[in-house]
Amino acid sequence: MKRRKPILSLIFLLILCVVLQSAAFADGSLLSNADFSLPELPDGWDTVAYEAENYSVYTQNGALVIASAAENDVRVCQMVQVEPNTVYRLSAEISAEGVHGGRGVCLSVDNYTLDGAYAVSAGRTGSFDWTRETLIVRTGAKQSYINFALRLGSYSETSAGTARFRAAELVQTNDPEEIASAVSLDEPAQPAVKTVNESDEARAIRLRSYLHLFIICTIVLACVLLWGFYRNRERFYSLSADPKTVKRCFILLVLTGAALRLVLTLLFGGHDYDITCWQAWGRDIVQNGASQFYTAPGHEWYDYPPGYMLVLAAVTWLLDLFRIPSGSAAAVFAYMLPAYAADVGIAILLMRFARKRGFSESACLYLGGLAVFNPAAVILSGAWGQIDSILTLLLLLGFSELFEGRRISAGAIYGLAIMTKWQALIYGPVLAAEYLLSIRKKEDALRTAGGVAAALLVIFAVSLPFRGDQGFFWIVGRFFNSAGGYDYASVEAYNFLALCGGNWKSAELSLAPGIPYKAFGMVMIVLAVVLSVAMQVVSRRREGGETLRARPERLLIPAAFCMFMIFTFGHYMHERYVFPVMALLAFAYAATRDNRLLVSSMLLSVVLALNETTAMYVVSNAASAAVRGTQQHQIVTGVCSLFEVLTFFYTAKVCLERGFGQKDRR
């Protein structure tokens, strides 16, 4: 009998374990510890947040609570083993108090750091009592794990408020309707960057080492490329080439540039946030029309003006026409192509401008190649997928019309630039000054008024399809909402405020005792505008009656200086806002043949290429949690910001000398 007691005890324990296990998975759920009745977060659940402050995660009355005072993307995740090519139902009861902005309370599969797959439920905002939220997914052919997340907000759809979750389940389903509606996880947006067994510490170390690698590669490649261009410029200029040869060579440059960007697209797949937005926004407009785009629930955070949304819709429509699957490499490259087309357009404009200024055919080809292979442009339209080159092209087209005295068409193009990116408004004071200073007779005043009317008409026409049931001036409110959407001193822009520790810091914090970042930024923005307009006034008086066509640098240099100074010392700056300045400086060089302006453009290209590379990496889904805010990130930010500030001071010296002093320096 004594021998049987241990055996009976062991059998009893085994039975107890089976009973408990059965109770835990009585409903077939694959989640473990989904009962949030304990005062602490159960084992197996991990918390991840985009913003590291102003949120809390806790359990209360058998529910998981996620509360965030500021808009954030907070998720509580559990890694679950699943079967490949199988349909699963993810569900949970949710309730909310005062949830606003972005996606709201939702469920998701967040496999970005595993295999690139991602799916999210519809989500809900506002205040509501318990209701069930469901997400149906089909695992990929090679997927064995999914990262299930209870979530407040989502990627690029941050939310604030209090969200509650209970009765979370992850079960396999054979329901025909659910199988038909399942979201496929078999199209990863990014290659795998993490193994299941990799520790968080090892992953963080690896991702930080990638940051170092990207920085070194960017610096070396950008410097070698630009040094090669600059050192051999005289050799290019001295070559004799007829227009037909130059045309053939330029076509070869364009094809080579496209191939280079295709390689970068295949390697990087675009910036995960932005490419996801491009595809989702284009799909939304194609399927639901433009009228509800800005007003549908959860769309309050959409901060881009409507102009480029029409381009995204056109790209999506073409992809559907040719049956190219969304998320494929071909689709991602298609969303990259408009920006590269703008790069080519900038090169053509620069070549035409230089030809009019007396440059040889070979010299024009040199400048065109410099635009096509500009490191910052290559990264932006090849690796990232952003559209600042489109804004730059529109600004240059408007400037070119103004050079020829065509004020009305210049105004219309400027209106289109505003509808493409809000940052076009930064150039408004300099353009307004040029319009007003060039009024000499009644006809000039009428054409100036016509230019303003043309800009407003284009803004109204482009925004009209998106108005829906909003007022006629809805676009003004959308601009002000977007302007305050990133209340930071610097948003990964390596400038003076970032050098002073303001990167991703609230603009309300103090740069110095009694001086908030925002107040300092406003003063410097006003100073930049005043200096730029003064430069225009002085240069016009000095040059007498010469037209803008004869002296285009009278607009190009103040515009470049104004934006560069605002970027360096202003608040709310993103890393890409200074992009058009590179082209403006290159055009100013073609207008004056002042080599210092070409050097400034090249230096800024290196600075911006470095800023883009690190920003694209630091803000990516895969690396942000492991890299952003670390000591390595702070060191990189400090060094790069110092480089940017020094580049600005060199450029400012050249611009101020030309604007207030020298008339000619070849």
Feature roles, as predicted:
Residues 2, 427-457, 467-469, 580:
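Perimembrane helix-loop-helix junctions
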Residues 25-213, 512-515:
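Extracellular and organelle-lumenal recognition/adhesion modules and their flexible linkers in secreted
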Residues 2-17, 25, 203-263, 355, ...:
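Start-transfer (signal-anchor) and selected internal transmembrane alpha helices
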